[in-house]
Structures are given as structure tokens and as C-alpha cells.
Amino acid sequence: MSPRAARRLLVLLVVAALAVLVLAPTVKRVLRDITLPLQYTSVIRAQAHAKRLDPALIAAVIFAETKFDARTSPTGALGLMQIEPSTAQFLAHRSGATTFTLADLADPAVNIAYGSYYLRYLLNRYGQSETLALAAYNGGETNVDRWIERAHAAGARFTLSSIPFPQTRAYVARVEHAQASYARDYGL
């Protein structure tokens, strides 16, 4: 290789290295935004504060339910946090909402408020256990009550591995993983 070609190659390598250094944070941020999206941060933070919840938990539930892409599920659950109509009516009654309609759940702020209210309710019901609250959010309170009874009857503690529904067990693990990621990557 000629000295002139070697210099060109060296300059090219230096420019490439600088480009990588400059673009790496942007690429990392873009990849994070694709693989771990986050929207409605101010609503999430406000609801977390109002309901005494970890904002990363709210974001993780939204991620597990819809990846921040609101849509109606085949079961009829609504909005970002996929709230079942019967659960929404229960929450509206319990919270004293007087003008609530199911259509309100299409509004991300309302949906996050109701989903956060439900998470707080479940955490209170299950002794602040996020595992139990998340299992109930996904698998239903009646099922969780039954699973707790079975575990206690067997003289065991209820743990993630105690959940007999593979979908619910995977859901809880997915939310817990996403919660840690939101706390780490977004500082929630």
C-alpha cells in the first residue's frame, strides 16, 4: 500500500471512529425507543404520585398490555392498560365517578388513571405484593384468591412459580422485567 493510500485509510478510520462515538448514543436511544417505548410520561408520573405507585410499574403494565399502542383486545379489554369493561364499571363506582362511560377508556389519561387506580386497589388487597397484584391484573382476583388458598393449604408461600396459568406467570415476569428496564433506562 502506498503512503498516500495508507494516510487515506487512516483518515477514513478516524472519521469512522468519530462517527461511531458521536452516533452511538443516538442509535442506542433509537433502539431503546423501539424495543422499550414510553409515551404519556407526565400522565404516568402524575398517576404514580397520586396513587403511590412506582411509575416504572405503570409503564411496564402498559408495555406488557399494549406496548403503548391502544387497541381493543379480542376479550374486549380497552385502552392502553387493557381494562375489562366490568372492571372499569367497578372502578368507576368505587372511585365515585359519576359521568364515566366505557368510551372514556379510549382517552389515554383516563385509561392510565383507571389502570393505576386498579393497580393500587390490587396492591392494597394483596398486602403490597406486586407479584400477586400483577397476577390478579392479568389472571383475575378470583383465581389469585384460589391460588393463595392452595398454597397456604399446602403450607407453602405463594410465589411466581406458584401461578398455574403459564400466560399469567409469563405476564408477571414480563412486567417485572419491563419495570426494571423502565427504571434503569428512563429513570422512572
Where are these regions (language model features)?
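N-terminal Lys/Arg-rich, disordered targeting/topogenic segments
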Residues: 1-5
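Basic side chains
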Residues: 7-8, 174
